[in-house]
């Protein structure tokens, strides 16, 4: 379950720090959050899809590590991002 190009560009434009920013932690976390949301919806329809469930757990772990990194380097940006994405942390 990957994101289509248009969705990815839209998320990138919304969360980028400057015009050419495509790889900052903010953008990566936002893209991972969208992928996690899509996989969660997929797993509601197909609860026996264990491969997707494992992929979901991997993505959640990756997002958690990026959030921890952002929190340790720039707490204000971390809080802003969590509020924008409506994450429970």
UniProtKB/Swiss-Prot annotation:
Organism field: Protochlamydia amoebophila (strain UWE25)
Pfam families documented for this protein: Ribosomal_S15 (PF00312)
NCBIfam families the record matches: S15_bact
Highest taxon in the source lineage: Bacteria
Protein name: Small ribosomal subunit protein uS15
Subunit structure: Part of the 30S ribosomal subunit. Forms a bridge to the 50S subunit in the 70S ribosome, contacting the 23S rRNA.
Xref: Gene3D superfamilies: 6.10.250.3130, S15/NS1, RNA-binding (1.10.287.10)
Family matches, as InterPro entries: Ribosomal_uS15 (IPR000589), Ribosomal_uS15_bac-type (IPR005290), uS15_NS1_RNA-bd_sf (IPR009068)
RNA-binding found in the keyword field: yes
GO MF, any single term: structural constituent of ribosome
Record's GO cellular component terms: cytosolic small ribosomal subunit
Keywords associated with the record: Ribonucleoprotein, Ribosomal protein, RNA-binding, rRNA-binding
UniProt entry tagged with the keyword Transferase: no
PANTHER family listed in its UniProt record: RIBOSOMAL PROTEIN S15, BACTERIAL AND ORGANELLAR (PTHR23321), SMALL RIBOSOMAL SUBUNIT PROTEIN US15M (PTHR23321:SF26)
BP term (GO), one: translation
Family membership: Belongs to the universal ribosomal protein uS15 family.
Purpose of the protein: One of the primary rRNA binding proteins, it binds directly to 16S rRNA where it helps nucleate assembly of the platform of the 30S subunit by binding and bridging several RNA helices of the 16S rRNA. Forms an intersubunit bridge (bridge B4) with the 23S rRNA of the 50S subunit in the ribosome.
């Amino acid at each position: 379950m990957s994101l289509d190009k248009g969705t990815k560009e839209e998320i990138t434009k919304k969360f980028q720090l400057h015009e050419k920013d495509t790889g900052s932690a903010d953008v990566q976390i936002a893209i991972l959050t969208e992928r996690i949301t899509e996989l969660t919806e997929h797993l509601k329809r197909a609860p026996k899809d264990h491969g997707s469930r494992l992929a979901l757990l991997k993505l959640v772990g990756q997002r958690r590590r990026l959030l921890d990194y952002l929190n340790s380097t720039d707490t204000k940006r971390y809080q802003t991002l969590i509020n924008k994405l409506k994450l429970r942390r």
